Amino acid sequence: MGCFESKPDQQVQPVTVRSPTDIFWLVLYVVFWIALIVIAVFSFIYGNPLRIINGYDSFGNTCGVRSNDKFSNFPLSGMNTEDKPYLFFLDIKELRHTLKICVKECPQRELLNAAELYRYYEDRKTKLCRYDFNMSMLQTQEANQGAKYFDFNGPCPPFPVYQSAPVLHRCIPTGVNAPLQQVKKMYALINSWEATQQVFSDLYKAWPTIVLICALSLVFSIVMIALLHWLATIVSWLICIIVVVASVGITGVLWWSYYKAKHTLDTDQQLSYLEELVRNEATIYVLAIAATCIMIILLVVIYYLREKLTGLAALFEEAGKCMLQLPGLAGPPLLAFLALSVFLAFWVVVVVCLATANYPGVKPLLPLAQLEDSASIANDPKLKPELAGKNDTSFKSFKLVEYHDVNVLRHMLWIYIIGLIWTSEFIFACQQLAIAGAVAFWYFRKPTDSPVLLAIAKLVKYHLGSVAKGSLIITIFKIPRLILTYLYAKLKRHQQEGSECASCCLRCCICSFWLLEKFIRYLNHNAYTVIAIEGVNFCPAAKIAWNALVTNALQVATINGIGDFVLFLGKLAVASICGLISILLLRDNPDLHFYMAPVIIITVFAFFIAHIILSLYEMVVDTLFLCVCEDRTINGNSGRWKESNLARLLGEAPEEDAVEAPMQEVQLTPITKQPFSAQFLQAEMENSKA
């Protein structure tokens, strides 16, 4: 890729006329997105999360839906089931083979014979027989004396019909006479669904809450920016207090939620058969322990950094001064927020459809109705169901629908996971390059036109390829990091059993974490500052930025690191508050299989949004430090850095007068040790206007 080449250091000449950088990587990114769109189209065709959430009957109708697909040769398909949101199994003793229908409500009382079934239909207007069955047939003497209407194949359920309650839109017997073994089998049937389907169907069900809390995270992030700007002298302490309170709050709520979940399972033995509730309890327990550990670590770190927090006032004041003179800096974060919101919404919809992708198939035909060739199943009010004889050619057969998974599309989830990381990093990188370019132009040259618009124009016109390459490199090293995280959890269990091999692998895993973290940190957004100023490719820019920072005082890196840590605490505070709100809103929602899945997604999305907004300050600070490092190295005490508050962080007293210190114009931007000439500056300005 160019980043890994071992060559002697060469002076990188600044370009006088910019040209597009890293074009190949932009083409690769566009091709990747074309593949994502193609996969999305197929997911929309085959995916339907409501089939998992509400269930579907034996004729292919999804319960609780106004419009269902009409299949040829399936007479009872394509029905309007909007008023029938619950799935009812006619015979709970034959769950895998019995007829399933959508009903208005689950049976509210136990029904023992045909007369009670008809009376229930008259009282509750709830039909517990097949859609085409004439319920008046239950009043005949033949219906009360015979069992031919009451079978697992239908048209009506065999007796007794137990009192039931909806569990995840399925009617589960709850009456005192309900057979325990059959109830366990029904819960086992629900538990047999893939966990991935359940998780993504929960995301689909909770999308209004996800959107609401993500919008709140934007508001909280803007409030945090306002605090950084107007309360710079005490904002470090204020953020620490907020994050401590938020971490204590979410830890307390998690432990309280775990207590309630455990108490519910202990008091209602039947609920313990549902794996989703058990999984919720286990997940809350793990998250509560993790939140407790994080809270303790935060308290310890904040305690030991308390003396250094006061010195950050100068850092945030200087960043605030830059933002005050460049109000347009608020533009890139808002654009990035909109782009990320649209992408995350698109991503969630597609992965939900991918996880629920299936296609209709035909179950073994069940001869359920005696029909004339001209008869209509759906509209013949005199229909009298009879079980067909084996050799009777006047009988037609019902074709029952069963959906089968599209395994090829399921595997496409991995491509979308890569797409989530790469596209998110791409959006972050675009924002960072635009901000870095604007701040660098402001620091070195103070152009009369808008530096923000100039930086955005250069990004779109020249540097999208470099952004695509930089975000891909980070993605390549983040994916193994996720894999190693999974291996860490597995190997830790074997290490406790005394496995030397697992212990060795665990050490290698930790070492890999460290190396990957260092490499990703090396490819930080300082490279985008160099790209914005010099117009070079990503890898040379990363090398230049690294050398510029390494050759300067350790104190600069320390203060910069503490400043980034405080901003990270701000992002963590926003994510914690949003996670706390989501737990309170979703934990009592009966329609969710695994409510902790939306909570985790909301927390991650809130952190992403806070990262976009608060990275404005982070990028301004890091860019100013990079500019100050080069300014100090080349211009010494005559550099502009002497007049800023950052001089205190370098152990110097800032200039008291407001007169700008004399500077040599040809040495204003010497990041490559090749100072820009006046002719180059003039050409750059003309190029930006072109």
From Swiss-Prot:
It holds the Pfam family Choline_transpo. The chain crosses the membrane at residues 23-43, 203-223, 237-259, 282-302, 334-354, 415-435, 464-484, 565-585, 594-614. GO terms for biological process: transmembrane transport. Belongs to the CTL (choline transporter-like) family. One of its GO terms (cellular component) is membrane. InterPro entries: Choline_transptr-like (IPR007603). Glycans are attached at N134, N391. Keywords: Glycoprotein, Membrane, Transmembrane, Transmembrane helix. It is found in: Membrane. This is Choline transporter-like 1. GO terms for molecular function: transmembrane transporter activity. It is a multi-pass membrane protein. Its main location: membrane.
